[in-house]
Design a protein with these regions (language model features):
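Cytoplasmic helix-loop-helix junction between adjacent transmembrane helices
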Residues: 96-134, 329
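C-terminal transmembrane helical hairpin of 12-TM major facilitator-type secondary transporters
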Residues: 246, 252-258, 263-323
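Conserved MFS/SLC helix-loop-helix module at the cytosolic interface between two early adjacent transmembrane helices
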Residues: 51-90, 269
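Extracytoplasmic gate region of multi-pass secondary transporters
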Residues: 20-24, 203-265
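Hydrophobic core of transmembrane alpha-helices in multi-pass small-molecule transporters
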Residues: 11, 91-107, 214, 301-315
Length: 397
């Protein structure tokens, strides 16, 4: 039950957000805004998500995830409705940035992984996290064509309202993820939240993980938000890649192959050193982006790139969270996963915002693509020395 409804929760939350890039041009064109405006809203959404995630995680660890997820589902629906009816930048940013950013802290991986960590045996934990991540990937694959269909049939405003109704399904889903009190009474002595935080931030491997996770956020959010307009811009020279169908198919392929990638990373993470798998993922991304820029653009090259990136897309999540659980145990897993996730969201903010900012000033995304490549090599290096051993305090967790 936990795997099924936890997977459904991230299917809805991650699936809806994965399609936001499709709304970039329709919304900015209709309102006469620059791409920087939409990019800033999504960037703030990711930053708020990351900044508040440790707090939401601590509340979920302390009081139970169910209440947190119900509130998150309500905020998600309100945020989408607010995006639909907003006609000025401030209201749009509050709805899409603040409300949905807060909602995602309560409905995505960190909270669900906390539930799994407390209720799944340690020898199956990373596998279960891979299953949950694969469910989120399925949501991305499912929702991209659905959101494009809503856009084409009803326009951006009505499409967002319908997505808001869909987001409200997260509230009854949360009801099925209620935990018994026994799940929170884990044997970790009398360690407090403050002590757990101090223990984590002083751990070199935890710091290296957070650096690598910054890169993950930068790359995936830049591509999710700016791939569609990037392909549209290429249409003047390469008309075949500018069709909305190409961008929709590419984003759907990312979601499809992400299913296999996240499941595979969870499976392999039970059998091989997770740090080496993480390093390989980041290096693979750098190579894939480099090849995408060097090969003449075409629908086929775009689909191949999307498939490779999809396989590597969120495969970092079960591995990173698995290492955190392995080192520190599961009592404060939601909070500590949220803390390392904050670094991911700082990267997301930079990827989303820099994409729009530098495009509006240079007329090109090339510089941001090059940054994404360099960061991939950096993350490959910093994950290699991570130590996966449990610290003495939580050796039996």
């Amino acid at each position: 039950q936990i795997l099924i409804f936890g997977g459904l929760m991230v299917t809805l939350s991650m699936g809806i957000r994965h399609g936001f890039g499709l709304f970039n041009l329709p919304i900015t064109t209709a309102n006469g805004w620059g791409r920087e405006t939409f990019a800033l809203t999504i960037a703030l959404q990711n930053l708020i998500w990351g900044a508040v995630q440790p707090i939401t995680g601590a509340l979920a660890d302390r009081y139970g995830a169910f209440k947190i997820m119900v509130i998150g589902g309500a905020l998600y629906a309100l945020g989408l409705a607010g995006m639909a009816i907003s006609t000025d930048v401030l209201n749009f940013t509050i709805a899409g940035g603040l409300l949905i950013g807060l909602a995602q802290t309560a409905t995505t991986y960190s909270v669900v992984y906390g539930i799994l960590g407390r209720n799944v045996p340690a020898d199956k934990r990373v596998w279960a996290m891979g299953i949950a991540a694969a469910a989120g990937s399925f949501g991305q694959f499912l929702m991209i064509p659905a959101e494009q269909g809503l856009l084409s049939s009803f326009g951006a405003q009505n499409a967002l309202l319908l997505l808001g109704l869909m987001a409200s399904l997260m509230m009854p889903t949360a009801w099925m993820l209620r935990e018994g009190k026994v799940n929170h009474n884990l044997n970790l002595g009398d360690q407090t939240i403050k002590e757990a935080l101090k223990e984590a931030v002083s751990n070199p491997s935890f710091r290296l993980l957070t650096l690598g996770y910054f890169v993950c956020g930068f790359q995936v959010v830049f591509i999710a938000v700016h791939l569609a307009p990037y392909l549209k811009d290429l249409s003047s020279t390469f008309p075949a890649v500018g069709s909305p169908a190409v961008a929709t198919t590419a984003l759907a392929l990312i979601g499809l192959f992400n299913i296999f990638g996240t499941y595979s990373s969870g499976y392999l993470g039970q059998r091989f050193p997770k740090r080496f798998l993480l390093s390989g993922i980041y290096l693979g991304r750098a190579i894939a982006i480099s090849a995408f820029l060097l090969i003449p653009p075409s629908p086929i090259s775009t689909y191949v790139f999307a498939s490779i990136m999809g396989f590597l897309w969120l495969s970092t999540i079960p591995l990173t969270n698995g290492i955190v659980a392995q080192i520190f145990g599961v009592k404060y897993l939601t909070m500590l996963s949220g803390l390392v996730f904050f670094s991911h969201q700082l990267g997301s903010f930079c990827g989303a915002f820099l994409g729009g900012y530098l495009f509006d000033r240079t007329g090109s995304y090339l510089i941001v693509w090059q940054i994404a490549i360099a960061l991939g090599v950096f993350a490959f290096i910093v994950n290699l020395p991570v130590k996966e051993r449990a610290i003495t305090r939580v050796a039996n967790a």
